[in-house]
Amino acid sequence: VLDADFTPSLAGPAILEKSTDPHLTSEIARYNLEINLDPFVIQGKALSETHRHLDDQWQKVEELAARQHKKLLLCGILPTINHQHLTVDYMSPQELYKILNDIMRMTRGKAFDIQIQGVNELIASLDSVLYEACNTSFQMHLQVAPDDFVRTYNWSQQIAAPVLAAAVNSPFLFGRELWMETRIALFRQSLDMRTSLNHLREKQARVFFGDHWLENSVSDLFKEHIARFPLLVTRPVEEDSLLAIANGDVPALRALRVHNGTVYTWNRPCYGRGGGRPHLRIENRYVGSGPTRVDEIANFAFWLGLMLGQP
């Protein structure tokens, strides 16, 4: 969400207040909004339907923004963003974001530092997690059968480099030319809660790609993440998952899903349920937003084609 001079705007929450569409949600910064698309069965004109849905949702938000005299832009890293847009005044008002920020600051025990070496070098420091707000992505999900998950997840890891190479679009941050896709380095460092001692112990960063192939089942990934990363936020959980299964119901696994949402693997395993049935998905998180809706659908088609065409 941009002001007339194409700098980040504070108007995101005001736009969100005027919307009754559940597809539109907030993000950590007031100038970022998220559009969630409906799932489609991969057959016939699925990509065209996804494109049409994206266009329809975009037009709705664009009209709401225009009433506030604001503009919308799809961009992995906005070239006009700078440190003045990373103060707490620009953080979204929802309590969750304040809690996450406070917990991460307390865990780290010092400011969040970034050092990125590219064509130029950037060294900067911030006392909040709002470096994360510089990143926006086009997150793609593919539902996978449980029996195929290990093979498909490993394949998603294998193809990540060529897919990212075809989709890079964020070379600039704070006026510096850095990586061809600066989001990768920035996101990893912006949420790195490790102290120097943690680094010496080779503790895993919370944003990571992975360091081994998956061998047995998706539960190995979830167990590994639970063992490696402490809880950041919790919510009341009244459901007894084992009892739900015994009664023939589909458990929500709410605690697992909340924790999984704070582990930022570039290919993230996801558990969900819909229509009374559980499902597993692989979420691609490394492709940037934009620069146009056509580009996003093209990136989706490329990734989807590779995922479905695995040898």
Where are these regions (language model features)?
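Phosphate/nucleotide-binding catalytic core
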Residues: 1-311
